[in-house]
Regions:
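Nucleotide and nucleotide-moiety/phosphate-recognizing core
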Residues: 2-161, 166-185, 190-195, 200
Length: 201
C-alpha cells in the first residue's frame, strides 16, 4: 500500500488567469482567505511534502513555507509545464497534482487515487466527475502519477505538444469517478467565485 509519505502534492498556481482579468488566482480571497490556503488545508493531511508551482508573487507563495517552483518555460505553457517542474523536484515516488482554484477538493482524493493506481499496471490515475445528468467529465489536472514519468513528459513536451489528454493517451492511465462534482468546482471568472461562495455559506 502506498503511504501518504510516498506522495508529494503539487499545487498548480502558475496560470495566466485571463478570464479573471489576469489576477493571480491562488491569491484571490475565498471566504476571506486566499484560494491557495484552501488547497493547502485540504491536501496537507493526504500527502507528505507539498510543492507550489507559481510564476509570479513568488515571495507571497513562499511565505506558506513550501518550495515554490517556477515553470522552466516563460510563456505560461499550461499545467503540463507545472507537472514537469514538479516531477523534476519531486523527492517521492508519486506526485499528486491539484489546481489552486478548487477550494472544495476532496479530502480523500489521494486515498481513492492510490486504490485505483494499485489496482493495475497504471502510470497515472486522474479524477473524473459524474454530473447530475449522468455525464462523466474528466478532471485531468487532479492526477496521481509516478514521478518516474519525468522523462516521458519531457519527451512529449519537446514535440511542442501541450495538451494534457494527449500525454495521457500515450500512457497506461485510469480514472476515479467522484460523485460530488462540486468538490472539483474551480474558479475561472468573478461570477463563478461569487456563485461558489454563495453555495458554500
Amino acid at each position: 500500500m502506498i503511504s501518504k509519505d510516498q506522495i508529494s502534492a503539487l499545487i498548480l498556481a502558475g496560470g495566466r488567469a485571463q478570464r479573471m482579468g489576469g489576477i493571480d488566482k491562488g491569491l484571490i480571497p475565498f471566504h476571506g482567505k486566499p484560494l491557495i490556503e484552501s488547497a493547502i488545508a485540504r491536501l496537507k493531511n493526504q500527502v507528505g511534502p507539498i510543492l507550489i508551482n507559481a510564476n509570479r508573487n513568488i515571495t507571497k507563495y513562499a511565505s506558506y513555507g513550501y518550495p515554490v517552483l517556477m515553470d522552466e518555460t516563460v510563456d505560461f505553457s499550461g499545467p503540463l509545464a507545472g507537472f514537469s517542474i514538479g516531477m523534476k523536484n519531486c523527492k517521492t515516488p508519486f506526485l499528486l497534482t491539484s489546481p489552486c482554484d478548487s477550494p472544495l477538493l476532496p479530502t480523500d482524493l489521494a486515498a481513492k487515487m492510490v486504490v485505483e493506481l494499485e489496482s493495475g499496471p497504471f502510470d497515472l490515475v486522474y479524477a473524473s466527475t459524474k454530473e447530475d445528468n449522468g455525464k462523466i467529465w474528466a478532471q485531468p489536472v487532479f492526477c496521481l502519477m509516478r514521478s518516474s514519468l519525468e522523462d516521458s513528459l519531457n519527451t512529449f513536451l519537446a514535440t511542442g505538444e501541450l495538451k494534457i489528454d494527449r500525454w495521457f493517451q500515450a500512457l497506461q492511465s485510469s480514472t476515479v469517478i467522484f460523485d460530488d462534482a462540486q468538490a472539483f468546482a474551480n474558479v475561472n471568472t468573478p461570477e463563478e467565485l461569487q456563485a461558489l461562495e454563495e453555495a458554500t455559506q
